Regions:
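Iron-associated oxidoreductase/ferritin-like identity signal
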Residues: 1-193
Length: 193
């Protein structure tokens, strides 16, 4: 029994190193999303779409909060945090529809990265990591549901500027996503999480 305890203890640091590397790599995705969403917020504000702009600014802040959660996990696990370099994001989009199509693709990429982290944590038997990542799995379900919903609404609006302005107003009032369900709780928006 003593021998198996020593083996498990000696393997844990190497297993945790792999997970730590993967989490640090994922931090780049969270910070890049935050930076990209800030650029999107600015672009939308320049187009006088205050509702969409405010929504994307909130999304930018939310992504930094996600990164902070992972940083807290690493610090609490006595692991090294490596802050990533963030590239300058795009600053132009062909349309509001094109912008939200990019949001949806970005969220799908973040989801894939979280799923990769979860797989590593499960493989390494890191229960505290899977517990932390459970929240992210539910959050990403919500994030993708919201992005998909907005893309569908914008497709319905098409070239109708009145419909676009109505949707922008709904974002400004905070009612645009009130019926989007997602996450494990099945309740409204991610801001309630």
């Amino acid at each position: 029994m003593e021998q198996s305890h020593k083996t498990a203890t000696s393997q844990r640091p190497e297993a945790m190193k792999e997970l730590t590397r993967a989490i640090n790599d994922h931090l780049a995705a969270e910070f890049q999303a935050s930076h990209t969403y800030l650029a999107m917020s600015i672009w939308l504000r320049e187009k006088d779409l205050a509702g969409f702009s405010t929504y994307m600014l909130d999304k930018s802040n939310e992504e930094r909060t996600h990164a902070s959660r992972m940083i807290a996990y690493l610090v609490d696990s006595d692991e090294q945090v490596e802050l990533p370099t963030v590239e300058a994001p795009e600053r132009q989009w062909p349309s509001v529809q094109g912008l939200f199509d990019a949001v949806y693709e970005l969220e799908k990429g973040v989801t894939a990265s979280i799923n990769r982290l979860y797989g590593i944590a499960e493989q390494q038997g890191e229960r505290s990591a899977t517990a932390m990542l459970d929240w992210f799995v539910a959050e990403q379900l919500q994030e993708e549901a919201e992005a998909r919903f907005v893309c569908k609404r914008l497709r319905l609006a098409g070239d109708n500027s009145a419909a676009l302005l109505l949707l922008d107003q709904q974002f400004l009032e905070g009612t645009a996503l009130s019926h989007v369900k997602g996450g494990l709780s099945g309740t409204g928006s991610a801001n309630q999480a």
